[in-house]
Amino acid sequence: QQSRTPYTTEQMIHLYKLLHKLGGDNGMIRQTEFFVYSKKDRDALEKCMELGYRFPEITTWIRASKKDFELVRSIGVKETGVLVSCSDYHIFHKMGLTRKEALDKYIGIVSDCIEAGLRPRCHFEDITRADFYGFVVPFASRLMEISRESGVPIKIRACDTLGLGVPYPGVALPRSVSGIIYGLQHYAGVPSDMIEWHGHNDFYKGVVNATTAWMYGASAVNCSLLGIGERTGNVPVEAMIFEYASLRGTMNGMHPEYITEIARYIENDTNYPIPPMTPFAGQNFNLTRAGIHADGLMKNPEIYNIFDTESILNRPPKVSITGTSGTAGIVFWLNHSYSRRGEKEYTKKDPLVAKLYEWVTDQFDNGRITMISDAEMEEQIATLCEAQDL
């Protein structure tokens, strides 16, 4: 929504295939969500379903009407999201209803969804501004009654629509992430496996709030590739992959190397510029410009690299050449650019290193402020080697 140029049908299919590879056979990326209101979206949904993947399961987000329920059921979708906004801002000012009218309307929608043979996923929009005990708990409790009576599981997606959730202990509801997840379980009787967290990053708390929701019992968190989403974005799927690995000590079948392939595809094939410092995905996430850091990387990569980015993400650590790179930065750049290992490695004593250092120093002593590109380095190396037989 309002976040980037929409993907084409072919791009959606390709990204779905990459998500399948990224999540692995254990289905760590459990579900995906499609709109069904344009031919392009419906074509993508149908073609992705034809692939026959178990994971990610294809679900939809639809308007709450019997016609739409029948539409997604006819396609073969088994679960759909329905919007059930729960704050007074939405109930009173957006929909012009009372709380009772909203509750009755929502119960009718959920009943229609079940009657159509679908599993409802109720999106509790704006939950971090809702009356938790006055509306959220009674509504969620009623949904659990319907679930028991019908035998159909009903999920609740707790949506922090404006990113107002707070992860710290002792915070009052409705802004307490832990309080929301705890309250849904213990006051409304919602099982952990029926609770999802949907966060936004307006206050830079997207990832930490999602992790907090996990820790307090939400079985799933909603993510988007690279965190792309409305306004400031949502929770990046690549961030939660490493959060999961940090918490559990295992990737559990995920293949994080596909993060790199996804990032390059989004940047090169969909023309979406990824900020270079984006963790795990940006061009410069494991790049250093400081000579002292390059010196440490040469002695032991673990000193200044967050983990073995080469084996996990197919992204070896890099250095760029600036006025602070020193001979250490130049040596590191040479060895990695030309795959020098062992006895063939350049050292600070090599004549080529000395000449390059002299040239780099001269560049910045004469007013240069931009880093030296790889192409410039290669051109200068060719010039030096030709002139001095280095």
Give the role of each language-model region:
Residues 32, 36-61, 65-71:
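N-terminal active-site wall of soluble small-molecule enzyme domains
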